[in-house]
Amino acid sequence: MNPTENGKPPTMTPLNRPIRPGLLSAALLTVALLASACGQETPEQGASAAVIDNDRCMDNQRAGTITFVTGYHYQASVSQLEVIAAEAMGLFETLCLDVEIQPGSGDVMGNAQLVSAGTAHFTPAGNEAEIVQANERDHEVVGIATYGHVPISTLLTQQNVEHLTDLEGQTLGHQSMLPAPVEAMLVEAGVDVDTIEQVEAGYDPSVLPRDQIQALTGFRSNEPHQLDAMDEKYTEWLPEDFGVVGSFGVMATNPEWAEEHPTVVEDFLRAVARAFDHCSENGEECVGYAAELDEAGYDTEHNLKVWDTERELVGGSTPDDQVNGYIDLTMTAEEAETLKDSGELDSVPDLEPLFDPRFLEAVHVATEVVWPGDE
């Protein structure tokens, strides 16, 4: 297995996966619900009046303020930047959704706990394995969209590491927990993970070239770009090069709350899908929306690289006949097996209650998001 040098991921190609039949009847029902929408200009042009019928609007308003907690501050990651852009563009408002965005600290399980408790309503998880792990910790969350179908977690080492087994007896830094795809990669490579000292290393990747640690987990859209900007040398190890499956950019919500407010969940995902399409063509504009929220200063150039890297990975791992965010439980099961293989799980739980594609499928016809007023 050859590692990737200096953060340049291989070209992604669409995965040859079985087609999940879309819920066309649900999508047609959505069209019917929106049939009375007014024929105004698109929300990107600044319209604020509701574009859905009164009954649906009232249903959405009854949910009150909807809190979205970001994964990590206002970073331009998939499943995060689109929400920021949807709010800035007025897309939520046109669907009668009152969305409040709160910055997260990078504590995935902490965010899951907030959603499970009903303190927050939506949050991104790093991958589908984290949805499983959260529920194993009694944080009741459900994955409603998975945007990336390749591991985004990566392992960076100093260049003198020729084999992953060289890390035995060394120190590995992570942000809050060892990502499941990275742990699975280490196990697949024959590493005795128990011999590696694991520490929380924070979010400054310069600890790696300063030799404070010998390996660092991260996101291929983030830390490699940061180290490249510092002109530092490193070796990047990608889980898929070791046969490890994975995902990223998973939108999560509270399952009980979602059943109480199905139109809210549908229209939240509708606005996010609309924003993704817009931001794919207008990355600088959308990153600018995130910059406006960050009072501590914002590296616009770096965050544009984060967004471009992740949206390309989404496109490369989504088959042409699937919607962005599709859920394939066969792939989910393969990812969950990595948790079992690494000892994180004794057995793989029933995954169907943990992932629900109905809300995403209800707002799409074929691969296109249904938006009121569009021809």
Task: Report each predicted region and the residues it spans.
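Conserved C-terminal helix/tail region of periplasmic/extracytoplasmic solute-binding proteins
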Residues: A333-E375
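Secondary-structure end/capping motifs
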Residues: H261-E344
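Bacterial signal peptide processing site
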Residues: G39-E41
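Pocket-lining segment of extracytoplasmic ligand-binding domains
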Residues: Y203-D299
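Short, glycine-/small- and polar/acidic-enriched structural segments
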Residues: E44-A201, S206-R210, Q214-G218, W237, ...
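C-terminal motif of bacterial Sec signal peptides marking the signal peptidase cleavage site
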Residues: A32-A37
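Sec/Tat-exported extracytoplasmic proteins
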Residues: E87-L91, L95-C96, T119, P124-N127, ...
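Bacterial N-terminal signal peptides that target proteins for export
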Residues: T4-A26
